[in-house]
Amino acid sequence: MAEELEKSMHKEESLMEKIADKIHDHDSSSSSDSEHEKPESPSALKAKIYRLFGREKPVHKVLGGGLPADVFLWRDKKLSASVLGVATAIWVLFELVEYHFLSLVCHILIFALAALFLLSNAHAFMNKTPPKIPEIHIKEEHFLMIVSALRNELNQAFVILRSIALGRDLKKFLMVVFGLWIISVVGNWFNFLTLVYICFVVLHTVPMLYEKHEDKVDPVAEKTLKELKKHYMVFDEKVLSKLPVASLKAKLG
């Protein structure tokens, strides 16, 4: 009788343990499901958003950071407005007033030298110490740094042009030809100085506006690029793939 009582108690304990295990498993599974269904953080969602040209850095970093990026993005409004104002004054002076660059440089030098000459003689006449004119010289290391950076950019451009001329990349060839054609068309509308001024104004407006509205611009840009890729694939299939260059490249590949 005692043994049967012990067996029944043992069965009840094992049954209670099974029920407790099932409850525990259900709680753990529900908690894991809730973790999976938990919405991602805003930073993670923002990281997955498409950015224009596939960039992963902020606009400030893309522009190189430092003072130039601060000027283009209007971090310091007074400095940015001053730079844009000086550029506008130069453009008005040369284009609208039709002042010549060589004449401007000569007149500025004449005015500066005359003012310093008269000031130095006036101080000597009044027995005062003449004004200190600082020595101006370009450091060799800075000059070599600029020349080296320019040389690297030119060499990289020559490598790209050579690879295009050898017919290795038809897509790049068409893009470069189209870009040069666009530049030639724009060059017929404006002279060089006006074109430089327009680019300068664009650099002072477009990055700043894009940084403010990038969350609205990027989805539109993503859709546009997808449509362009679709059209390019159709063009590649119907036209480019039938060209002798493309077939020769496929055979060599």
UniProtKB/Swiss-Prot annotation:
Bias kind Basic and acidic residues: ranges: 23-40
All residue ranges annotated as the Reticulon domain in the record: 68-253
Region: Disordered, residue numbers: 23-43
Transmembrane segments: 78-98, 99-119, 173-193
InterPro entries the UniProt entry points to: Reticulon, Reticulon-like
Membrane topology recorded in Swiss-Prot or TrEMBL: Multi-pass membrane protein
Chain positions with N-acetylalanine modification: 2
Cellular component terms (Gene Ontology): endoplasmic reticulum membrane; plasma membrane; plasmodesma
Key words, A-Z: Acetylation, Cell membrane, Endoplasmic reticulum, Membrane, Transmembrane, Transmembrane helix
Subcellular location per the Swiss-Prot or TrEMBL entry: Endoplasmic reticulum membrane; Cell membrane
GO BP annotations listed: response to bacterium
UniProt keyword Membrane, yes or no: yes
UniProt cross-references to PROSITE patterns, sorted A to Z: RETICULON (PS50845)
Protein name: Reticulon-like protein B6
